[in-house]
């Protein structure tokens, strides 16, 4: 597909982007609403912000990396941009949806492209119960927390806490403990992406926890339900030689070797 109306969203805090942005000034400016493609210049964190910020416009996104790793991004290129955009392949992903309730019974809702993490809020470990539907997966997990990861996010925080890498087409979610103390050997669980996962804080008074959806945090959480929201779809564009699925496979090989 040929993309002509481009909206550029760039991280103004990124020095590399500020240096390179003059290369994109030749393009006519379009608002996100009137564009047919949103190009995001920055790192993974900025990409996640822009996906959420502009999701209401239902436009495809093409990320160009100026961050540290840029797993969700393409390489930052200067030449033949319109050709690169038109030749790129679309990957469609749906985010996780969290519906959490605080200790004060206030409902908090947020989506996450990578993962939703429940984390201890103070010096004491968290005490969590985890269910898949009505089935109890873990009656009591004493740990620094737990997370639920999508395939797209499985090589991020999930991998750093020894969670499994999921193929993009696996139709699975990873439930991964963070520094588990009891049971010490529990490595988590891989479940269908049709599952609804419930996590309850068993001791809100002595062991408060927060919840983080990608980069959005809520504190003093009592319980949360997490599921894939299929009503929301993000279309991400990737260069044919730099596909998201290829990146995930590379990480799988690295994990097997290490």
Language model features with spans:
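Proline-centered loop/turn at the N-terminus of a beta-strand
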Residues: 58-60
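ATP/NTP phosphate-donor binding region
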Residues: 1-37, 41, 46-56, 76-92, ...
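ATP/nucleoside-binding phosphotransfer catalytic cores, i.e., glycine-rich phosphate-binding loops
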Residues: 110, 118, 134-138, 186-258
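Gly/Ser/Thr-rich active-site loops/lids in small-molecule metabolic enzymes
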Residues: 147-184
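Generic beta-sheet signal
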Residues: 62-64
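Short glycine-rich anion-binding loops that position phosphate/pyrophosphate groups of nucleotides
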Residues: 43-46, 67-69, 152-155
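Solvent-exposed alpha-helices and their adjacent loops that cap or buttress functional pockets
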Residues: 30-33, 90, 109-110, 120-123, ...
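Catalytic core of DAGKc-family lipid kinases
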Residues: 68-145
């Amino acid at each position: 597909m040929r993309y002509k109306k481009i909206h550029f969203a760039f991280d103004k805090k990124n020095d590399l982007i500020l240096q390179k942005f003059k290369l994109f000034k030749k393009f006519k400016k379009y608002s996100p609403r009137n564009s047919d493609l949103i190009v995001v210049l920055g790192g993974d964190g900025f990409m996640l912000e822009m996906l959420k910020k502009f999701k209401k416009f239902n436009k495809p996104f093409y990320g160009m990396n100026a961050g540290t790793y840029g797993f969700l991004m393409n390489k930052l290129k200067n030449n033949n941009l319109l050709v690169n955009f038109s030749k790129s392949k679309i990957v469609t992903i749906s985010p996780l949806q969290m519906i959490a309730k605080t200790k004060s019974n206030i409902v908090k809702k947020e989506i996450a492209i990578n993962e939703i993490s429940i984390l201890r809020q103070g010096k004491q470990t968290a005490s969590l119960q985890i269910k898949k539907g009505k089935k109890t997966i873990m009656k009591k997990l004493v740990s620094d927390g737990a997370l639920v990861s999508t395939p797209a996010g499985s090589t991020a925080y999930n991998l750093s806490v020894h969670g499994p890498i999921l193929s993009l087409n696996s139709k699975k979610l990873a439930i991964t403990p963070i520094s588990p103390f009891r049971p010490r050997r529990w490595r988590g669980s891989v479940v269908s992406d049709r599952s609804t996962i419930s996590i309850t804080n068993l001791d809100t008074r002595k062991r408060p926890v927060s919840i983080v959806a990608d980069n959005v945090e809520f504190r003093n959480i009592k319980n949360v339900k997490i599921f894939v929201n299929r009503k929301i779809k993000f279309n991400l564009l990737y260069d044919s030689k730099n596909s998201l699925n290829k990146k995930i496979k590379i990480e799988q090989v690295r994990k097997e070797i290490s």
